[in-house]
UniProtKB/Swiss-Prot annotation:
Keyword Nucleus: yes
UniProt feature coiled coil, ranges: 74-256
SAM domain boundaries: 446-511, 524-588, 612-679
Lineage summary: Eukaryota, Metazoa, Chordata, Craniata, Vertebrata
Protein name (record): Kazrin
Organism per entry: Homo sapiens
Any one GO biological process: keratinization
Tissue specificity as recorded in UniProt: Isoform 2, isoform 3 and isoform 4 are expressed in several cell lines including keratinocytes and bladder and epidermoid carcinoma (at protein level). Isoform 2, isoform 3 and isoform 4 are expressed in hair follicle and interfollicular epidermis (at protein level).
GO cellular component terms given for this protein: cornified envelope; cytoskeleton; cytosol; desmosome; nuclear speck; nucleoplasm
Interaction with PPL, as annotated region: 174-333
Gene that encodes it: KAZN
CDD domains: SAM_kazrin_repeat1 (cd09564), SAM_kazrin_repeat2 (cd09567), SAM_kazrin_repeat3 (cd09570)
Length: 775
């Protein structure tokens, strides 16, 4: 198409140039003709006759006719030249008339001067010749003009054809351009529609991904809740069975127990009772039921002869207040099958005697009546510290039972089976009383049964009870254990479990030195895994903390590598969130009551933001008209301690966490203003609150701030906490090793990399040096 247009334009240009050249030639010819006419008129010859005038007029007419050129400029020039020729012809005629008049006058007035006829004839002949030549010139000019007119007609027809062709080509070009523009618009509309459809599909894809993620999280949460409910039901069933058996035993033991339960102060070696601050929720309901039975049933002489009496009840009144029971109910959260209560029931219940019970019952043949006589004699002895020794000697007394009592083939109504049922009930009560002794007795005074009860119920580690039974016989031995002894003697392969035991032992050692147990001892692993992680917005790590039995003491010793290696916390921000949550607990001296009181006061007011939970931060975000972005903070790890104690977490970081697009400057500026109004004055307020409710930010706590070193076990304590500036650098992911130098324990696992070496190192070994008898 473009080539055709170019060729057409070249042809049109050539035709126009040829026409211009022909017009130029015509002008030259007309100029020559005019010059010849001027020469003829200037030569003095006779003027042109009528024929010449007619021919000139005809020539003028033909010239005027020939001037009909499409090019108006050429026509105008031709017309001017024709009119000029007509004027010249008219002048010639006038000159001819004047000459004729002069001739007549000269013939009439001057006869003497009259020329001869011969001369006149000669002049006339000359004039006729000149006129003939002028006629010939005019005829030639006519012929030339006719020829030019024909050529002009041909040229006009060619120009018309060219114009028609050019118009058709232009029409085709216009149609092509119109179609091209239409197709281009259609293509642009199609591209825009595709872009909109792509954006819609992208939004739908991300919406589906978000819904799938939410559905997965919801399903996981529902599954975990279902598992927790199932485990809770199992725990409740186990506690119910244990309570029924304990109540049945207590119903029969009430007369003798009532006679032995004497009010008064509990005295150990003449000193006041050593009280531990932690309440055990497991024994609250049992001790309350026991107290009710003591004061409601009168003694019966027949029961006094038929029921065995445990010496542990003589000097340990089981009185518990309603507040303690309520606190126990609050702190008993659902847990898995490895919870301390379920383990207590599984070890204390007599339906399936395990290796521990087999070790406790040696095949020594002795009648049940002799055992009763022995107990009646021991009742008459003086009650004092020796009675506590007899409490832990019950394991030796139970060894006198016949192993045949555990045979399932015996009749349920036989005397042997009844005696077995009584022994199981007393064993359960003995275990509960031993747990009670853990609360009221220094660790150095513990016996083997108390150590086992502490390890199983308080520390929630029944998997190590068998090795503890074989190797640890008293609390003094437990205080002298090193990390190597814990690993090889008790089979504690997990470094976090070893750390938990070491921190607890050191806490009890400090308590014996004159200080009370740390407030961190009140924070069990159930509260840490369920309540605390949910408060800081990281409930997705609850199962890992639950599996590793992370309690309050463990929290105060966690390091970044512990979070990464053992607890699967790989995100830097989540690590900093956990560490800042621990820093907040440290500031309130690990007091749940102080923390809950401060959170209750700021629930409806935007004050004291350092103690805000993740849910309280979500509520604040909704209150400042950003509720469409509030759900993005769920399970994000953003809580009050991060907003106040982390200097690098500014308004930009908060906007990024909320998912506010970077182009929405008004929303980001609004968020920055709200944050500056709430969180900037929070530092001074947090210091005042810390001074009011707990340990000031600069003071060390009693668990990991003692500045000690235990050379025998490799346990090291470092005084002071890591400065928050270093945590801030770690939050910005610029310092990969932040918080690595913070902690209180060495991070050593037994064979974490090599499974074979782990099996060899975790093999249980017995040590004769650890088998220390009760003193």
């Amino acid at each position: 198409m473009m080539e055709d247009n170019k060729q057409l334009a070249l042809r049109i240009d050539g035709a126009v140039q040829s026409a211009s050249q022909e017009v130029t030639n015509l002008r030259a010819e007309l100029t020559a003709t005019n010059r010849r006419l001027a020469e003829l008129s200037g030569g003095g010859g006779p003027g042109p006759g009528p024929g010449a005038a007619a021919s000139a007029s005809a020539a003028g007419d033909s010239a005027a006719t020939n001037m009909e050129n499409p090019q108006l400029g050429a026509q105008v020039l031709l017309r001017e030249e024709v009119s000029r020729l007509q004027e010249e012809v008219h002048l010639l005629r006038q000159m001819k008339e004047m000459l004729a008049k002069d001739l007549e006058e000269s013939q009439g007035g001057k006869s003497s001067e009259v020329l001869s006829a011969t001369e006149l004839r000669v002049q006339l002949a000359q004039k006729e010749q000149e006129l003939a030549r002028a006629k010939e010139a005019l005829q030639a000019m006519k012929a030339d003009r006719k020829r030019l007119k024909g050529e002009k007609t041909d040229l006009v027809s060619q120009m018309q054809q060219l114009y028609a062709t050019l118009e058709s080509r232009e029409e085709q070009l216009r149609d092509f351009i119109r179609n091209y523009e239409q197709h281009r618009k259609e293509s642009e509309d199609a591209v825009k529609a595709l872009a909109k459809e792509k954006d819609l599909l992208e939004r739908e894809k991300w919406e589906l991904r978000r819904q799938a993620k939410e559905a997965t999280d919801h399903a996981t949460a529902l599954r975990s809740q279902l598992d927790l409910k199932d485990n809770r039901m199992k725990e409740l069933e186990a506690e119910l069975a244990m309570a029924k058996q304990s109540l049945a035993t207590l119903t029969k033991d009430v007369p003798k127990r009532h006679s032995l339960a004497m009010p008064g102060e509990t005295v150990l070696n003449g000193n006041q009772e050593w009280v531990v601050q932690a309440d055990l929720p497991l024994t609250a309901a049992i001790r309350q039921s026991q107290q009710t039975l003591y004061h409601s049933h009168p003694p019966h002489p027949a029961d006094r002869q038929a029921v065995r009496v445990s010496p542990c009840h003589s000097r340990q009144p089981s009185v518990i207040s309603d507040a303690s029971a309520a606190e126990g109910d609050r702190s008993s959260t659902p847990s898995d099958i490895n919870s301390p209560r379920h383990r207590t029931h599984s070890l204390c219940n007599g339906d399936s005697p395990g290796p521990v019970q087999k070790n406790l019952h040696n095949p020594i043949v002795q009648s049940l009546e002799d055992l009763e006589d022995q107990k009646r004699k021991k009742k008459k002895e003086k009650m004092g510290f020796g009675s506590i020794s007899r409490v832990f000697a019950r394991g030796k007394q139970r060894k006198s039972l016949d192993p045949g009592l555990f045979d399932d083939s015996d009749s349920q109504c036989s005397p042997t089976r009844q005696s077995l049922s009584l022994s199981e009930g007393e064993e359960q009560m003995d275990r509960l009383q031993q747990v009670e002794l853990v609360r009221t007795t220094p660790m150095s005074h513990w016996k083997a049964g108390t150590v086992q009860a502490w390890l199983e119920v308080v520390m929630a580690m029944p998997m190590y009870v068998k090795a503890c039974t074989e190797n640890v016989k008293s609390g003094k031995v437990l205080l002298s254990l090193s990390d190597e002894d814990l690993q090889l003697g008790l089979g504690v392969c997990s470094s976090l479990h070893r750390r938990k035991l070491r921190l607890a032992i050191e806490d009890y050692r400090d308590a014996e030195a004159g200080r009370s147990l740390s407030k961190a001892a009140e924070l069990d692993h159930h509260w840490v895994a369920k309540a605390w992680l949910n408060d800081i917005g990281l409930s997705q790590y609850s199962q890992a903390f639950q599996n590793h039995l992370v309690d309050g003491r463990m929290l105060n010793s966690l390091m970044k590598r512990d979070l990464e290696k053992h607890l699967n916390v790989s995100k830097k921000f989540h690590q900093v969130s956990i560490l800042l949550g621990i820093e907040l607990l440290y500031q309130v001296n690990f007091s749940r009551e102080a923390l809950q009181e401060r959170r209750a006061r700021c629930e409806t007011q935007n004050i004291d933001p350092v103690v805000w939970t993740n849910q309280r931060v979500l509520k604040w975000v909704r209150d400042i008209d950003l509720k469409e972005y509030a759900d993005n903070l769920t399970n994000s790890g953003v809580h009050g301690a991060v907003l106040v104690l982390e200097p690098t977490f500014n308004a930009e970081a908060m906007a990024t966490a909320l998912g506010i697009p970077s182009g929405k400057h008004i929303l980001r500026r609004h968020l920055a203003e709200e944050m500056s109004a709430v969180f900037h004055p929070a530092n001074s307020t947090g210091i005042r609150e810390a001074e009011r409710f707990g340990t000031p930010p600069g003071r060390a706590s009693s668990v990991t701030r003692a500045g000690k070193e235990e050379n025998s076990s490799g346990l090291k304590y470092k005084a002071g906490r890591l400065p928050l500036g270093k945590i801030g650098r770690g939050f910005s992911s610029k310092d990969p090793d932040f918080h690595d130098d913070y902690g209180s324990l060495q991070n050593e696992d037994c064979g974490d990399d090599d499974p074979q070496s782990r099996l060899e190192q975790c093999r249980l070994e017995g040590y004769n040096s650890l088998e220390v008898t009760n003193v």
